[in-house]
């Protein structure tokens, strides 16, 4: 007799199998070479994990693992806690709508998101100086104040008096780490959102936010040609183009999956193995922001959250003294990208669901929670770090945008209600 959770999982996998073009039981459709990976072995893995804990903790030989260094013992204990929780998530966390390369991968990402949320909550309750020193436990180079680079100190493209390179300013900007970060970042966002107008709204919106907060962060103080030409027209455009090209490639592809063991040669087996890391089927994310006022607000909320997560990167980096090239920045971005993949799918499914009563998925909840706690950390640790007040013209501009948006939504709603009233007559 199967456990109740496994029966539910099998029914879900069978439903997904039928959606992908298969009509039979998933177990019969699985390739013999990979069928073992889809069979539950939770008890076996629990016992293996227990054996690993016995070895790592020295439970049977306490003297061999005794350490006089309290910090080392605490570090090992914390990493063991994280490993146990991730193992639980890998085996027992709720599955998502994604099944490639394996549902367990996304359960593991779910566990990583929970750990990140809990760690951020712990950091939120610390003092700013203590939090900065705490970052040393993540990387030994952290906890040291570093000067922030300003890109708008000299906006000349051609510097005739420079001794070695007359295009020094342009050279330094192009070969800065943020140049490639823009390209790969927008390629990843295009794969997530799959809507070119929405991507351009985000691209231009973030540049406007850089102008808004450049009095607070030196990184945002950019030259006009850096912000408009290099960022928007070159880096962001190329990243969006490459991402949408990837989207169109998978959208036009015919998905007829054949098992690895049934491939005729080694090349076919290698291609099929690599294909396991691509989507099982490609769904179009239809956002339709102009479908109605409420849908417009829902899509606008998605844009605001995306932009807030991006802003949090720079404010966290500034307040916690994390240099741009430190791997902690890269780890956070990779984790956020992994979290955003199922989050975007869940949110789009939520918008397209016609049920009167519905709720967002677990990843949507986690993403919003992480975004909020990151923002609270930026606000708390940023207190007193930004002595320059926001310019009056910036406040006036965004106030006007907010009032205009409210007026637009009210007018739109009034017109719809007027049309519906006429139809009832």
Curated annotation (Swiss-Prot):
It is an enzyme of class 2 (transferase). PANTHER family: PHOSPHATIDYLINOSITOL SYNTHASE (PTHR15362), PHOSPHATIDYLSERINE SYNTHASE 2 (PTHR15362:SF7). It is found in: Endoplasmic reticulum membrane; Nucleus envelope. Pathway: Phospholipid metabolism; phosphatidylethanolamine biosynthesis; phosphatidylethanolamine from CDP-diacylglycerol: step 1/2. It comes from the Eukaryota. One of its GO terms (molecular function) is CDP-diacylglycerol-serine O-phosphatidyltransferase activity. This is CDP-diacylglycerol--serine O-phosphatidyltransferase 1. Belongs to the CDP-alcohol phosphatidyltransferase class-I family. GO terms for biological process: microsporogenesis; phosphatidylethanolamine biosynthetic process; phosphatidylserine biosynthetic process. The keyword Transcription does not apply. It is a multi-pass membrane protein. Its EC number is 2.7.8.8. Its main location: endoplasmic reticulum. Disruption phenotype: Mostly embryonic lethality with low frequencies of dwarf infertile plants. The keyword Membrane applies. It catalyses: a CDP-1,2-diacyl-sn-glycerol + L-serine = a 1,2-diacyl-sn-glycero-3-phospho-L-serine + CMP + H(+). Keywords: Endoplasmic reticulum, Lipid biosynthesis, Lipid metabolism, Membrane, Nucleus, Phospholipid biosynthesis, Phospholipid metabolism, Transferase, Transmembrane, Transmembrane helix. Residues 1-16 have a biased composition (Basic and acidic residues). The chain crosses the membrane at residues 42-62, 79-99, 105-125, 197-217, 227-247, 296-316, 321-341, 361-381, 390-410. Residues 1-23 are annotated as: Disordered. Expressed in trichomes, leaf veins and root vasculature.
